[in-house]
Design a protein with these regions (language model features):
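A generic structural signal for residues embedded in beta-strands
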Residues: 10, 54-57, 205
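Short, Lys/Arg- and Gly-enriched loop/turn segments at beta-strand edges
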Residues: 15-26, 62-73, 211-221
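Extended, low-polarity segments enriched in aliphatic/aromatic residues
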Residues: 146-175, 186, 194-198, 202-267
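Loop/turn positions that initiate beta-strands
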Residues: 5, 49-52, 200
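Short alpha-helix capping/helix-loop boundary micro-motifs
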Residues: 1, 38-44, 187-192
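Intrinsically disordered, low-complexity linker/loop segments enriched in Gly/Pro
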Residues: 61-199, 204
Length: 267
């Protein structure tokens, strides 16, 4: 639990939880278990946060963990994740990147070196039960329009791999049947993949449950305008330094029903 005005650091695994290795073949990309992503840190409660408030999150710094100064970019196989260009590039592929301060270079893409803008791909607050039910109805209906599509139009709850925290037995089993996957962005924030959400950014998140439940992860060394290959950023383990605050009653007072992002001035 933190208080409004607190500044703190949160460390993160890469989004696959360490499934991808710093080597020269793409078998781990081909065989990655996508029911085990995204790995997030949280939820972090903010004292005094109540449904209807806005949580203000300032991103103060984003960095690389000293024990993991490398990252990766992947092309997922069409049969396991795919991407927006999967019809053109159906086979798995991978590039590993070494970090040198603000620069990245890859032995798999010789002659390329550039400065990255590090940012979290995924950040948001917990949904209410009512909002969770809305998501499952909406996304279940989408999948039902093309149930045999590869890759599927949405990722539905996975009972076998849902992370239930301290919940046990029957309670955990019931929750796993409706636990939201983290692939799409939604009304709470989530997997937004905004490349300029870096140092100097501010985000206003709607609060749907007591204490808010802020979670973050999927850290990128750099990214283009979206992730065309689904794993199209330079994925990494890392840390975020953030400051949190509250706007009491902000959802009603400012008619806010979704996150508001103020991008970083970094380009």
């Amino acid at each position: 639990m933190v208080k409004p005005g607190d500044e703190f650091r949160v460390e993160y695994l890469d989004w696959t939880g360490g499934q991808i290795k710093n080597d020269d073949n793409a078998n781990d990309i081909r065989d990655v278990d996508l029911t085990q992503v995204h790995y997030l840190s949280g939820p972090i409660g903010v004292e005094g946060a109540e449904p209807g408030d806005l949580m203000v999150v300032d991103i103060l710094d984003v960095g690389v963990l000293k024990e993991s100064e490398w990252g990766f970019t992947g092309l997922f196989a069409k049969e396991n994740g795919g991407g927006f260009l999967t019809e053109h590039y159906p086979e798995a592929n991978k590039a590993c990147w070494d970090f040198h301060g603000i620069y990245a270079s890859s032995r798999h893409i010789p002659g390329v070196e550039f400065a990255g803008i590090m940012h979290p791909g995924l950040i948001g607050c917990l949904p209410s039960k009512e909002l969770l039910d809305e998501w499952n109805e909406r996304e279940g209906g989408l999948v039902a329009t093309a149930p045999d599509r590869v890759p599927p139009l949405a990722t539905l709850p996975s009972e076998e791999t849902a992370v239930m925290g301290r919940m046990k037995k029957d309670e955990a089993a019931a929750a796993a049947k409706e636990a939201a996957r983290t692939v799409p962005p939604r009304e709470h924030g989530g997997n937004c993949d905004i490349k300029n959400l870096s140092r100097g950014s501010r985000v206003f998140f709607p609060v749907y449950v007591k204490d808010g439940g802020l979670s973050m992860g999927d850290i990128h060394f750099s990214q283009g305008d979206g992730e065309i290959t689904f794993c199209g950023a330079i994925e990494m383990a890392g840390y975020l330094d953030v400051r949190v605050g509250l706007v009491k009653g902000g959802m009603k007072n400012y008619n806010v029903k979704n996150p508001i992002f103020q991008p970083s001035p970094l380009e």
